[in-house]
Regions:
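Juxtamembrane interfacial secondary-structure elements that flank transmembrane helices
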Residues: 23-24, 67-72, 105-117
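Membrane-interface anchor segments at the N-terminal boundary of transmembrane helices
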Residues: 385-388, 400-413
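Lectin-like carbohydrate-binding module/patch detector with strong preference for beta-trefoil
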Residues: 108-368
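Specific aromatic-rich, kink-prone transmembrane helix
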Residues: 4-27, 34, 38-41, 66
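Hydrophobic membrane-targeting alpha-helices
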Residues: 15-19, 47, 56, 60-64, ...
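Transmembrane helices and adjacent periplasmic/lumenal helix-loop junctions
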Residues: 3, 36-63, 98
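Residue-level signature of transmembrane alpha-helical entry/exit and packing/kink sites
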Residues: 2, 31-38, 84, 88, ...
């Protein structure tokens, strides 16, 4: 990728250098050719990697500098100078927008099939691709109702699913803090049967979808029952293991102690202006607000230690309006049996019947892809002993390991 980037960047800068030699000859054909070729190639470099923006900025600086030098020339009237300026701006903006949008339009049109790395995109984006997630989500019910079996995906940032298993939080953490010793709730980065939850209305005692169904709407109060362990999603005034300023999230176990269940959650559909008040699979982006505390269910980004199987921490946070508190239903089916063992078999063995794919417009895909290109490189970058911050660079307060001996501890900074 770097070789392609360098090719476009170097050829683009060469064209701009050629343009500088004829910068005052607006009626000359070479003036137009070199400017358009230069901006086209530098925009292609930007399409390859965002670091190509630096080459484009350099070219724009040279063009602006040359125009500044044209202003004192007595042979050029104010009208001619204004024409020079307007044509430069028009060509630069139109070429950049046309080339950039065309490249990504071709990219998104041709690459219509699922691949091994599409999990970084949102569920809606994945479901619009042929194969992969689309083959699972096609044909599944749209409206989330009482009795729906769902997987909840963290919508933005790291791809992971709300998860629980039969293991408990440790009684005490290494820093001396105590936990609730309730069932762990995490965000797991892989598909797993323990990612399934059942939506339940508090006033109902069964978990079966009835006819007519009871769709969940914006503002409704629900319980989330873990599909395998049958314990409800819960939060309470106990510090989270890795983020003590937030509340712990667990699945409630009744130990007959003075810690009653607080397992009611309010559904907030954040994009209801586009999808409506009813909670929809794939399309609706939701927040789950803990009724007792008004805290939001949130992916904290912290990784749990060995006792949490190195999965990611889920907390309840008082700051509701943040992207890490947004979730969406990815896989969805209706519960048909009240028997727990039968439900477990359905969760493990069920397959959806493909009917039609989720569709996204070009602009929806384009915007999401740009956001992922900007921020996905920051995900999964863990701190290590040789890491440094930009403020360390000019002061040289931290060293960089250039060479380490394989036979001894000798190293060079």
């Amino acid at each position: 990728m770097e070789s392609i980037l360098m090719q476009f960047s170097l050829f683009g800068l060469i064209c701009i250098i050629k343009f500088r030699k004829v910068m005052d000859r607006l009626t000359c054909l070479s003036w137009w050719i070199w400017l358009i070729l230069g901006i086209t190639n530098l925009t292609c470099a930007l399409c390859v990697k965002y670091v190509g923006l630096y080459s484009l900025i350099l070219a724009l600086f040279l063009i602006a500098y040359d125009y500044w030098n044209l202003i004192p020339r007595k042979t050029l009237s104010n009208t001619i100078l204004c024409i020079h300026l307007m044509i430069r701006i028009l060509i630069i903006l139109s070429v950049i927008c046309t080339v950039y949008l065309t490249v990504f339009y071709i990219h998104l049109t041709i690459l219509s099939k699922a691949g091994p790395h599409d999990s970084v995109m949102t569920s809606a984006f994945q479901a619009s691709l042929d194969g992969g997630l689309a083959s699972i989500t096609k044909g599944q019910p749209l409206e989330v109702t009482h009795g729906s079996q769902i997987t909840l995906r963290h919508t933005y940032g790291r791809a992971c699913w709300l998860h629980s298993h039969s293991h408990m939080y440790p009684l005490r953490y290494p820093d001396g803090r105590g936990s609730s010793h309730q069932q762990q709730v995490t965000c797991y980065s892989f598909k797993d049967v323990n990612n399934w939850w059942i939506v339940k209305k508090p006033e109902r005692n069964d978990l079966v979808v009835t006819t007519p169904s009871e769709p969940i709407k914006h503002g409704d109060i629900i319980q989330l029952v873990h599909g395998i362990t049958s314990r409800a999603l819960n939060s309470h005034d106990v510090a989270a293991p890795m983020t003590p300023q937030s509340q712990e999230v667990s699945c409630y176990i009744d130990y007959n102690v003075s810690m009653p269940a607080q397992n009611f959650w309010k559904v907030e559909v954040t994009n209801k202006d586009n999808t409506g008040d009813v909670w929809h699979a794939i399309q609706s982006q939701i927040r789950l607000i803990h009724v007792n505390t008004d805290y939001a269910l949130k992916f904290s980004g912290r990784q749990l230690p060995d006792w949490g199987f190195n999965q990611h921490e889920v907390v309840a946070d008082r700051l509701v309006d943040q992207t890490d508190s947004i979730w969406n239903v990815e896989e969805h089916r209706y519960t048909k049996s009240e028997d727990q063992k039968q439900r477990e078999r359905e969760l493990i063995n069920a397959e959806m019947i493909p009917l039609q794919a989720t569709t996204l417009s070009f602009w929806e895909k384009f915007v999401e892809l740009q956001i992922k290109m900007l921020f996905s490189g920051q995900e999964g970058q863990n701190s290590h002993m040789y890491s440094s911050d930009p403020l360390d660079w000019p002061l040289m307060s931290r060293g960089i390991a250039y060479w380490v001996s394989n036979d001894s501890n000798v190293n060079m900074y």
